[in-house]
């Protein structure tokens, strides 16, 4: 269902987030993430006037992960920033993502390593959305998914159960799509 029709309004700012996922020839996987901010009108900053339509932020983050979804490499680039010579020096800090696992304590690890003055607000928020992008990208390749038809005899329950309201273990979504796992929960 789409959003309701808005009242009369004027665009002031556009933030775009884009993530591409790649399977590499060496067996690793890359997530390339980019965040951009553009103002419609000129904006006066401490560093000078940024004309409308020109990037205020154009920031990129690439992480390389293995099949266990552990980050084995990371890099960041700041191609447009409000404080040139300052904002764009933080890129090397994002190597601190190496060793974190996207499925186990990732957001807490990001906070500990890159929050506040340890990182860039926008690159760090970009990092925080990578786990769900990885799940979408690698379902059936790295993360095993199931069709829920009840014929699946694997001993572990599907990872997506209890990860959102639609697939809560005691709900109608799991009863319909993963009936074996609702029954297993009730009988335990």
Kindly label every feature range from the protein language model.
Residues 37-188:
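Active-site- and interface-proximal helix/loop "cap" or "latch" segments in soluble metabolic
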